[in-house]
Amino acid sequence: MNVIEGGVAAPNAKIAIVISRFNSFINESLLSGAIDTLKRFGQVSEENITVVRCPGAVELPLVAQRVAKTAKYDAIVSLGSVIRGGTPHFDYVCSECNKGLAQVSLEYSIPVAFGVLTVDTIDQAIERAGTKAGNKGAEAALSALEMINVLSQIES
C-alpha cells in the first residue's frame, strides 16, 4: 500500500499571501503568524514570499485568481477576517469569499489555503489571531506547505 503524506519543509517554494486590509488590526497578526510559519517550518526564504493586499474579503478571490494566473507561485495563503454585524452582509461576504477561493484552487490547480476568519465577535477574532485559539494565519501557512508537498508527491 502506498501512502502519500506531505511534510511542511518546502525551502524552494514560492508563496503568495493575499490579505484583506479591512479589519487590519486582526489581519496583521494573521500575516505575522503566516510569515513566521513559512520561514520557520517551511524554510521558505523571505524573497520567495510575496504579500498582496486588497480592500476586503470579497476581493480576495479575484486577487488570488490573478496571482494564480501568473503561474509564478506554488501556493496561495488567503488571510482576512469577517466579523458578524447586524445584517445579512456577513453571510454573503463569507460565502462568496469561500466559494471564490475554492474555485481559484480548482481552476488553476494550486493550493489556496483558507486563513479567513469568519467569526461572531471581535473577541473571537482576537482569539484566533494569535491568542487562546492559536493563529489561523499560521495554520493556513502550514496547510499550504503540506499541500505543496502532497501534490508534488502525487505528480512524481
UniProtKB/Swiss-Prot annotation:
Q: According to its UniProt record, what is one Pfam family this protein matches? A: DMRL_synthase
Q: Which organism is it from?
A: Aliivibrio fischeri (strain ATCC 700601 / ES114)
**PANTHER family (alphabetical):** 6,7-DIMETHYL-8-RIBITYLLUMAZINE SYNTHASE, 6,7-DIMETHYL-8-RIBITYLLUMAZINE SYNTHASE DMRL SYNTHASE LUMAZINE SYNTHASE
Cite the binding residues for 5-amino-6-(D-ribitylamino)uracil: 22, 57-59, 81-83, 114
Please give the subunit comment from the record: Forms an icosahedral capsid composed of 60 subunits, arranged as a dodecamer of pentamers.
Give GO cellular component annotations, separated by semicolons. cytosol; riboflavin synthase complex
- Does Transferase show up as a keyword for this record? yes
What is this protein's name?
A: 6,7-dimethyl-8-ribityllumazine synthase
Identify the EC number(s): 2.5.1.78
Q: Which keywords fit this entry according to its UniProt record?
A: Riboflavin biosynthesis, Transferase
What function is annotated for this protein?
Catalyzes the formation of 6,7-dimethyl-8-ribityllumazine by condensation of 5-amino-6-(D-ribitylamino)uracil with 3,4-dihydroxy-2-butanone 4-phosphate. This is the penultimate step in the biosynthesis of riboflavin.
Q: Which residues bind (2S)-2-hydroxy-3-oxobutyl phosphate?
A: 86-87, 128
Q: Which InterPro entries match?
A: LS, LS/RS, LS/RS_sf
Can you name one GO molecular function term for this protein? 6,7-dimethyl-8-ribityllumazine synthase activity
Q: Which family does it belong to?
A: Belongs to the DMRL synthase family.
The reaction(s) this protein catalyses:
(2S)-2-hydroxy-3-oxobutyl phosphate + 5-amino-6-(D-ribitylamino)uracil = 6,7-dimethyl-8-(1-D-ribityl)lumazine + phosphate + 2 H2O + H(+)
The record's annotation in Gene3D superfamilies points to: Lumazine/riboflavin synthase
Name one process (GO BP) from the record.
Answer: riboflavin biosynthetic process
Cited CDD domains: Lumazine_synthase-I (cd09209)
Q: What is the lineage of its organism?
A: Bacteria, Pseudomonadati, Pseudomonadota, Gammaproteobacteria, Vibrionales
What pathway is it annotated to? Cofactor biosynthesis; riboflavin biosynthesis; riboflavin from 2-hydroxy-3-oxobutyl phosphate and 5-amino-6-(D-ribitylamino)uracil: step 1/2
Residues at the catalytic site: 89 (proton donor)
